[in-house]
């Protein structure tokens, strides 16, 4: 594999990661499919995917840095719901949402890693698509939590339970959490924001664990390739998040569900 070829693969996968990480279409599923298509599926490929996820995480930090600092009591500018002891997004909301997936993820880590194949992704794309449709069809007519600061601890925990579905490669963490939030009475926009903020500790924890298990696959010769993938994922994810938060004010998740079904069909024709 030539250096130029490696950089091209890094760029392509960086675009795929950044574009799909926070959309309800499954970045992992797309990375597995595109990785197999490019023939980049060895242990280094798995480590590379972990590294470029950090670029996507950084994009969320840049977008929501005020909120993230606010969770630990550091506020810049006006404090949401100032003077109230309730009605404000707190660190406890995030911790409650993390617990279910963290527990199951640690218990079934090795089993989950064994599911990283296109065939498994195909099934999860379809089931995740139906969950998006269910969220649109069965959500309350009037959301009980319109904004991010209206989300209750119970809703946060239930969103965390839905997040467990994303342990199945190809399901989509954002798709599971946003759909779960909507079914629990959270507005589409607030559920999306909560999903993005929740992604920071969840993805960071998973990334650190994966890096710990695969650090011996890293070498200085891979730094340029990893750097290209990281930067590309960061830039594309930043654009994708901003665009996504704009369009969900005007459209439902039905187009994303249809897209998932189409991708599942392509996977069936190519890999089955």
From Swiss-Prot:
InterPro entries assigned: UppP
Single GO molecular function: undecaprenyl-diphosphatase activity
Its membrane topology: Multi-pass membrane protein
UniProt KW keywords: Antibiotic resistance, Cell inner membrane, Cell membrane, Cell shape, Cell wall biogenesis/degradation, Hydrolase, Membrane, Peptidoglycan synthesis, Transmembrane, Transmembrane helix
Segments crossing the lipid bilayer: 6-26, 45-65, 92-112, 115-135, 189-209, 221-241, 251-271
A GO BP annotation: peptidoglycan biosynthetic process
One GO CC term, this protein: plasma membrane
Cellular compartment(s): Cell inner membrane
Catalytic reaction equation(s): di-trans,octa-cis-undecaprenyl diphosphate + H2O = di-trans,octa-cis-undecaprenyl phosphate + phosphate + H(+)
Main location as per UniProt: membrane
EC number, as in UniProt: 3.6.1.27
Cited NCBIfam families: PRK00281.1-1, PRK00281.1-2, PRK00281.1-4, undec_PP_bacA
Any further remark recorded for this protein: Bacitracin is thought to be involved in the inhibition of peptidoglycan synthesis by sequestering undecaprenyl diphosphate, thereby reducing the pool of lipid carrier available.
Protein role: Catalyzes the dephosphorylation of undecaprenyl diphosphate (UPP). Confers resistance to bacitracin.
Entry similarity comment: Belongs to the UppP family.
Name under which the protein is recorded: Undecaprenyl-diphosphatase
């Amino acid at each position: 594999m030539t250096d130029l070829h490696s950089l091209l693969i890094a760029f392509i996968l960086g675009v795929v990661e950044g574009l799909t990480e926070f959309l309800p279409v499954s970045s992992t599923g797309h990375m597995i499919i595109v990785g197999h298509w490019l023939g980049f599926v060895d242990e280094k490929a798995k480590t590379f995917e972990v590294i470029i996820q950090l670029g996507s995480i950084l994009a969320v930090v840049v977008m929501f840095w005020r909120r993230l600092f606010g969770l630990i009591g550091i506020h810049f500018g006006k404090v949401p719901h100032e003077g109230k002891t309730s009605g404000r997004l707190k660190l406890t909301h995030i911790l409650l949402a993390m617990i279910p997936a963290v527990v199951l993820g640690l218990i079934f880590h090795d089993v989950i890693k064994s599911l990283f194949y296109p065939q498994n992704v195909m099934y999860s794309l379809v089931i995740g698509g139906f969950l998006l449709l269910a969220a649109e069809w069965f959500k309350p007519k009037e959301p009980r939590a319109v904004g991010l600061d209206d989300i209750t601890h119970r809703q946060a925990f239930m969103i965390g339970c839905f997040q467990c579905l994303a342990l199945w490669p190809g399901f989509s963490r954002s798709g599971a959490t946003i759909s779960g939030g909507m079914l629990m009475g959270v507005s589409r926009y607030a559920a999306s924001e909560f999903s993005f903020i929740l992604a920071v500790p969840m993805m960071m924890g998973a990334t650190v664990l994966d890096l710990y298990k695969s650090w011996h696959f890293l070498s200085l010769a891979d730094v340029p390739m990893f750097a290209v993938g990281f930067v590309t994922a960061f830039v594309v994810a930043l654009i994708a998040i901003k665009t996504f938060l704009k369009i969900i004010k005007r459209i439902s998740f039905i187009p994303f569900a249809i897209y998932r079904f189409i991708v599942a069909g392509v996977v069936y024709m190519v890999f089955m």
